[in-house]
From Swiss-Prot:
Organism, scientific name: Thermosipho melanesiensis (strain DSM 12029 / CIP 104789 / BI429)
Record GO terms (molecular function): DNA binding; DNA ligase (NAD+) activity; metal ion binding
Enzyme class: ligase
PANTHER family per UniProt: CHROMOSOME TRANSMISSION FIDELITY FACTOR 18, DNA LIGASE
Function noted in UniProt: DNA ligase that catalyzes the formation of phosphodiester linkages between 5'-phosphoryl and 3'-hydroxyl groups in double-stranded DNA using NAD as a coenzyme and as the energy source for the reaction. It is essential for DNA replication and repair of damaged DNA.
Annotated residues for binding of NAD(+): 32-36, 81-82, 112, 135, 169, 285, 309
UniProt superkingdom: Bacteria
The protein's name in its UniProt record: DNA ligase
InterPro entries, per the entry: BRCT_dom (IPR001357), BRCT_dom_sf (IPR036420), DisA/LigA_HHH (IPR041663), DNA_ligase (IPR001679), DNA_ligase_AS (IPR018239), DNA_ligase_CS (IPR033136), DNAligase_adenylation (IPR013839), DNAligase_N (IPR013840)
Cofactor: Mg(2+); Mn(2+)
Binding positions (Zn(2+)): 403, 406, 422, 427
Keyword terms, alphabetized: DNA damage, DNA repair, DNA replication, Ligase, Magnesium, Manganese, Metal-binding, NAD, Zinc
Family: Belongs to the NAD-dependent DNA ligase family. LigA subfamily.
Length: 662
């Protein structure tokens, strides 16, 4: 029994280390497959020996439970807000005031990026995660412990057994924000207005399994009572936090004077659009903790820190029209067309209005002057209406009575749904958008069929559903303007080749609502073929890790549809692969790590990656000293130069194939 306990503890430490490498350092040293194997082994042991379970095990970051509400908790020390400024003059006044109060000619400052997320305070006892509290009103916050445990960059055990309270910011990366909103709009859910709202809405979920799926992230920047750890400056504290295993923002800098602060602010004003998280300014802190104590604080904010905010990326323009777009699931999305404006160096003339409820809430009309802002510094969005500029000639934007494409009926699938959909199952626009996913690299990967060809094929009524693509003939394609004999032959060759597509990518191509690449892979591995998947019950699906009630319901509904059954039968008759192949594996590449750069001739990157992993090797997204080979295709990127500097062996695609066959 002692050996079992030791093995569980060993696995926890190993997984925690790999979590730190992946989520904090962004430098993994094992493949996803190896990581999943370790985690699965730990889950099995904890289930088999529940007396050795721990609330701070890495297994607590997956799955989740439902609570009835959040308990109110008082902070050990208040979480104060910051005074802020938007201009250089006031930041110089702040510097002069600090120097005057301290009676010094110069003061050192730490400049940190001001992450626009949700502030959190986290307490550890003997290195073990104990409690997380939201900022709330600064005095009392909500106990959000279970939800914060699901954030992969927040350690459940520290590298050293300190009892410590730290503070930081929880945020949703822009890529995750865009991904969520895309799915939300496709499924008729309310999208989030910006990444901050997305983080706030997620962290307040009563079901922590939802938090686990939304991939929130964090930066930790503050230690309560730093003198307890012999720390004298904020700069030392940031380094100390890194050593404990926290994710600390690497963009922070140390400034000796106010000119350095202003230069950094100007630099980040321009560069913030390149970040994968939303920042709205800098936080300027006096570096020396002794000086911070002397300066003290008011009832609302510390005197030793200030937020130096960026100017808003917001401009006024006039809406000249509203376009109605139909997605693959039939959802009708209104898009505002407005007079072009330059928004942070980009000419913008359109922005999604999400849904008709959003339009009604903001009372947006054609002819209105509105403010356009970049949500997260990236996505143009209508944020408010300038109602005082109305003339009375503005036109209300009404919910359409029929589909703007096919004139079919429109409505909601359920009473609670926000989205308005085209209810015509044969709407050509729905088919066009679905086909774009079907032929994409993440699905059947049929090159030569782009958006324009899809539009022409559907408009010519050559296909009525996605399965019809496998029944196209040279005669059919000859009717499409712009396609010569060579192009037709190439397209048909690609269609034939795509019949061997792995099951997980076939599932992506089916376009099941709420089922993306990751879920498709889980389903393929679990059910092995389309017949078993199509007959899976809700109860079977809900037991699978990472498949929640909504996804399970969506899968069952999809396969119960008569049209789906017809499509599956047509795919079978066409000879499309509908089962997971058992791949023979070898250890030829065991212990070897590969990176890939440039365009490959015979295989896609995913195919090469699969071959490497099937033969015991690993694939890294970056080149490091641990990389053994770089496979270089045509037009290689920066990885090639780095590989040369590190003396990594560079091989061609042909060399790699010889290595495998040898």
């Amino acid at each position: 029994m002692k050996n079992i306990k030791e093995e569980i503890e060993r696995l926890r430490k190993e997984i925690e280390y790999h979590n730190y490498r992946y989520y904090v350092l962004a430098d993994p040293i094992i493949s996803d497959e190896e990581y999943d194997r370790l985690l699965k082994k730990l889950i099995e042991l904890e289930k088999k020996y529940p007396k050795f379970s721990s609330p701070n095990s890495p297994t607590q970051k997956v799955g989740g439970g439902v609570i009835s509400g959040f308990e109110k908790v008082e902070h050990t020390t208040p979480m104060l807000s910051l005074d802020n400024t938007y201009n250089e003059t006031e930041i110089k006044e702040f510097d002069n005031r600090i120097k005057r109060l301290l009676n010094r000619n110069s003061v050192e400052y730490v400049c940190e990026l001001k992450i626009d997320g949700i502030s959190v305070s986290i307490r550890y006892e003997n290195g073990e995660f104990r409690q997380a509290i939201s900022r709330g009103n600064g005095i009392i916050g909500d106990d959000i412990t279970e939800n914060v445990k699901k954030i992969k960059s927040i350690p459940l055990r520290l590298f050293k057994k300190y009892t410590i309270e730290v503070r930081g910011e929880i945020f949703m990366p822009i890529k995750e924000f865009e991904k969520y909103n895309k799915i939300a709009e496709e499924e008729g859910l309310q999208p989030f207005a910006n990444p901050r709202n997305a983080a706030a809405g997620t962290i307040r979920q009563l079901d922590s399994s939802i938090v686990a799926k939304r991939n929130l992230d964090s930066f930790i920047y503050y230690i309560v009572n730093p003198e307890n750890y012999s720390l004298k400056t904020q700069w030392e504290a940031l380094d100390f936090l890194k050593k404990l295993g926290f994710k600390v923002n690497r963009q922070s800098i140390l400034c000796k004077n106010v000119e350095c602060i202003i230069d950094f602010w100007k630099k980040m004003t321009k560069e913030r659009k390149n970040l994968d998280y939303w920042i709205d300014g800098l936080v300027i802190k006096v570096n020396n903790f002794e000086f911070q104590k002397i300066l003290g604080e008011t009832s609302k904010s510390p005197r030793w820190a200030i937020a130096f905010k960026f100017p808003a990326i917001k401009k006024k323009t006039k809406i000249i029209d509203v376009e109605l777009n139909v997605g693959r699931s039939g959802i009708i999305t209104p898009v505002a067309i407005f007079e072009p404006i330059d928004l942070d160096g980009t000419i913008v003339k359109r922005a999604s209005l999400h849904n008709f409820e959003y339009i009604q809430d903001k009372d947006i009309r054609i002819g209105d002057y509105v403010y356009i802002e970049k949500a997260g510094g990236i996505i143009p969005q209508v944020v408010s209406v300038v109602k005082e500029k109305r003339t009375g000639l503005e036109k209300e934007i009404k919910i359409p009575k029929s589909c703007p494409v096919c004139n079919g009926p429109v409505g909601k699938l359920t009473e609670d749904e926000i989205a308005i959909r085209c209810l015509n199952p044969h709407c050509p626009q729905k088919l066009k958008r679905h086909l774009e996913i079907f032929v994409s690299k993440s699905a059947f990967d049929i090159s030569g069929i782009g958006e324009k060809i899809i539009d022409k094929i559907v408009d010519a009524k050559l296909i009525k559903d996605i399965a019809d693509i496998f029944y196209l003939t040279p005669f059919d394609l000859a009717q499409i303007s712009g396609l010569g004999q060579k192009s037709i032959a190439k397209i048909l060759e690609q269609i034939e080749k795509s019949k061997k597509t792995p099951l997980n990518r076939v599932i992506v191509g089916l376009g099941i609502p709420m089922v993306g690449e990751k879920t498709s892979k889980i389903l393929a591995e679990k059910f092995k073929n389309i017949e078993k998947l199509s007959s899976a019950t809700y109860d079977e699906l809900i037991k699978i890790e990472n498949i929640g009630p909504e996804i399970a319901k969506s899968i069952v509904t999809y396969f119960q549809n008569e049209k789906t059954k017809e499509i599956i039968n047509k795919l079978k008759k066409a000879g499309v692969n509908l089962e997971e192949k058992d791949v023979k594996k070898s250890d030829k590449l065991k212990g070897l790590t590969f990176a890939i750069t440039g365009k490959l001739k015979s295989y896609t990157r995913e195919e090469i990656k699969k071959i490497i992993e099937e033969n015991g090797g690993k694939v890294s997204n970056s080149v490091s000293s641990k990389t053994n080979f770089l496979i270089a295709g045509e037009e290689p990127g920066s990885k090639l130069e780095k590989a040369k500097r590190l003396n990594i062996k560079i091989i061609s695609e042909e060399d790699f194939l010889k290595l495998i066959s040898g």
